[in-house]
Amino acid sequence: MYGSLIRIKEIINDLNPSERKIAEYILNNSKAISDLSIKELAGKSGSSKSAVVRLCKILNYKGYKEFRIAIAKDTVNVDKEENRYTDINPKDDLHTIIKNISYNNKKSIDNTMEVLSEELVEKASEAISKAYRVDFYGIGASYIVAMDAFQKFMRINKNVRATPDTHLQVEFASNLKKGDVAVAISYTGETKDTFESIKAAKEAGATTISVTKFGSNSISDLCDINLFVLSPEITFRSGAMSSRIAQLNVIDILFTSVAGRMFEEVKEFLENTRKSTRVKRIK
């Protein structure tokens, strides 16, 4: 499954009835879409041209033409087993597991590149660069991503915080000020504790950034800047693997962008941390 079809699957439950009719028709007839005009798609799905246009915008396409081209590209090899995200299967041998998990992780990064807005990454990088304090909030697998962000930004001497204690998270958030930044990491965008922390940060006046799945959700709807990842949930939800990889990739992008902006200021800190950890190596 490729980017455009995954986008539809991710947001289909949030669509209104007319938009959902179109989405369902596309998922069930993906190979035929490239041959349909906007009027024909509206008619076959029992919807309207205006609903098709709205759906294209929701999916972050400039118009139906761009969307139709994306669908055509995505369906070239859609029937091949190698082009589908896979989950735990007790019948898989080790070779298949290595191949499938590597594919899942790689594809989640490729798909995220399609929905990650350069303009919003720029805004997020600028906000973090200028901020006095930066908080990262996450629970479970998303806390691992928050800690990765903490470790990276600490290396360039940013005043960063991350904690697994949800009480401390919301206390940190409530004491932020205008000019500070809070980053909420939650794949679903519906994690209650993370939502409460980012809500407190926003109410305190901080700039709020989300790293969530593509589309509308409670956390992205609340935040000032949304950095979407695109990695479909698998039935077993085996440890949030590919979605975590996509989130980590977004953090790497943010860190590299911020460090590049501040390079003359932070290169000394990067060198200092490199030297300080050298003594921890065996060789």
UniProtKB/Swiss-Prot annotation:
Family matches, as CDD domains: SIS_RpiR
SUPFAM superfamilies in the record: Homeodomain-like, SIS domain
Superkingdom assignment: Bacteria
Keyword line: DNA-binding, Transcription, Transcription regulation
GO biological process, one term: carbohydrate derivative metabolic process
DNA-binding region boundaries: 38-57
Domain HTH rpiR-type per the UniProt entry, residue ranges: 2-78
Domain SIS residue range list: 124-264
Organism from which the protein derives: Clostridium acetobutylicum (strain ATCC 824 / DSM 792 / JCM 1419 / IAM 19013 / LMG 5710 / NBRC 13948 / NRRL B-527 / VKM B-1787 / 2291 / W)
Statement: the UniProt record of this protein carries the keyword ATP-binding: no
InterPro entries listed in its UniProt record: Homeodomain-like_sf, HTH_RpiR, RpiR-like, RpiR-like_SIS, SIS_dom, SIS_dom_sf, WH-like_DNA-bd_sf
Name under which the protein is recorded: Uncharacterized HTH-type transcriptional regulator CA_C0191
GO MF annotations in UniProt: carbohydrate derivative binding; DNA binding; DNA-binding transcription factor activity
